Amino acid sequence: MTETVIEARGLSKSYGDFHALRPSTFSVPLGRILGVIGANGAGKTTMLNAVLGLSSFEGELSVMGCDPSTERGKLMQDVCFIADVATLPKWMKVGEVLDYVEGVHPRFDRAKAMEFLNRTNVPLDRKVRALSKGMTVQLHLAVVMSIDAKLLVLDEPTLGLDIIFRKQFYAALLEEYFDENRTVIVTTHQVEEIEHILSDVMFIKDGEIVLEAEMDALTQQFIEVMVTPGMEEEAQKLGPISKGVTFGKTTCIYKNIDREKLAELGETRRLGLADIFVATMTGEG
């Protein structure tokens, strides 16, 4: 039986009449990479703060067998939380950053970080503010890769970086860090760049989980049809969740409709994660 890393039942967070996170029930198994995707203010960070024991919450929540609200000290022995690269202390030298992380995280392996940095051109005596974007990413990776955590939580980790450096970050995360004994949670709104590394996905809108699925199943559920002229009425009868016009033709997106039936309406194609996200957030169903 697969070990469960996070188990939430009715997890919610409100500020007066404002529901930052509506009652949510979900679980995250060991050895998965979960993408938590939503617009700014959707509730992603609120959920993470509850998981990390950084804020109070309503409902039930267990993270690696611990209650984050009462056992945060024990929990953080096995958890690493990294926000975007802009959070690296710019006034510190690279070597001082390693000193700092070594002092605050019990599972940080300085020797491993040095081994990683020695393969780069990042100078230990240079202040973070003087590093190029590429060097900043390398330092960020050195910190992430060198913390032996069972749960790695990344909140918009590549915010503000150019696409080349964003891709470099995620490639290294997948190739050099992740294995079946670790679980990774990534929040982002840059959907296309993490699609290839995810095993599971969760969409959040206005504090509510509107979709939760394994990636393999998700890409089977959603199909787009470029409707053959004259078949628009039949296409509407099947209940598309989203409609549009492409090259003068009606396009419809369907969820959980047999592909053979849809093929009778026109040309079909499977959707990427970004298209599924947009259809789910803006669609009719």
Feature map (PLM): residue ranges:
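Helix-to-loop junction immediately C-terminal to a conserved catalytic motif
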Residues: 52
